[in-house]
Curated annotation (Swiss-Prot):
GO annotation (BP), single: translation
GO cellular component: cytosolic small ribosomal subunit
Stored PANTHER family: 30S RIBOSOMAL PROTEIN S2 PROKARYOTIC AND ORGANELLAR, SMALL RIBOSOMAL SUBUNIT PROTEIN US2M
Cited Gene3D superfamilies: Glucose-6-phosphate isomerase like protein, domain 1, Helix hairpin bin
Protein name per UniProt: Small ribosomal subunit protein uS2
GO molecular function: structural constituent of ribosome
Keywords linked to the UniProt accession: Ribonucleoprotein, Ribosomal protein
Organism name: Salmonella choleraesuis (strain SC-B67)
Pfam families linked to this entry: Ribosomal_S2
Sequence similarity: Belongs to the universal ribosomal protein uS2 family.
SUPFAM superfamilies (alphabetical): Ribosomal protein S2 (SSF52313)
Length: 241
């Protein structure tokens, strides 16, 4: 199973927290000390906590669970999309729309509209419209794709959230808490760990650190899914006998 070592984390700068004046005292148990007015995260805590989170995500994937990757700030956006796509999972990487989980009924209607517009753009419907109407629909399609493209094939609520930056994505975390969906999150020294089921104390800004987390999670999800596919194949083989 995918695991991450102390050396990997040091190389990626996972241990660099935020400036000391921005700290959240609830993160004290995970802070090693300060250097040049920047908090240093205790990787002796982070390494086992991250590997424990990976093991749990592996189990969720092995039982066909859906993982929703959430990272809407610019530093994480592209990497979040790539990681989710690489393991056939789902993502929100632009803006978290309030109610995305708690008001799933409405979101489902917007997804239906997005799929209808996609069909229209491909079956020649747009070409039959006036220029103005076609432009309006194209803009609507782009807007919906931006907001919902990463969850349009999710087919229901996710079984877990993997979040980059608990502070920035606090609305998503609150919605998951309300619905009892487990939250796995990268929590920096300026963030509140409350509401996060699997806290991963670490830098949430450095591209290398963000890529390290996402790469490991995508790998563990792929592994979990292949276990599920292998057991399905075994079952059908037994039935055939």
């Amino acid at each position: 199973m995918a695991t991450v070592s102390m050396r990997d984390m040091l190389k990626a700068g996972v241990h660099f927290g935020h400036q000391t004046r921005y700290w959240n005292p609830k993160m004290k148990p995970f802070i090693f000390g300060a250097r040049n007015k920047v908090h240093i995260i205790n990787l002796e805590k982070t390494v086992p906590m991250f590997n424990e989170a990976l093991a749990e995500l592996n189990k969720i994937s092995a039982r066909k669970g859906k993982i929703l990757f959430v990272g809407t700030k610019r530093a994480a956006s592209e990497a979040v999309r790539e990681a989710a796509n690489s393991c056939d999972q789902f993502f929100v990487n632009h803006r978290w729309l309030g109610g995305m989980l708690t008001n799933w009924k409405t979101v489902r209607q917007s997804i239906k509209r997005l799929k209808d517009l996609e069909t229209q753009s491909q079956d020649g419907t747009f070409e039959k419209l006036t220029k103005k109407e076609a432009l309006m629909r194209t803009r609507e399609l782009e807007k919906l794709e931006n907001s919902l493209g990463g969850i349009k094939d999710m087919g229901g609520l996710p079984d877990a959230l993997f979040v980059i930056d608990a502070d920035h994505e606090h609305i998503a975390i609150k919605e998951a808490n309300n619905l009892g969906i487990p939250v796995f999150a990268i929590v920096d020294t300026n963030s509140d760990p409350d509401g996060v089921d699997f806290v991963i104390p670490g830098n949430d800004d450095a591209i290398r650190a963000v890529s390290l987390y996402l790469g490991a999670v995508a790998a563990t999800v792929r592994e979990g899914r292949s276990q599920d596919l292998a057991s399905q194949a075994e079952e059908s083989f037994v039935e055939a006998e």
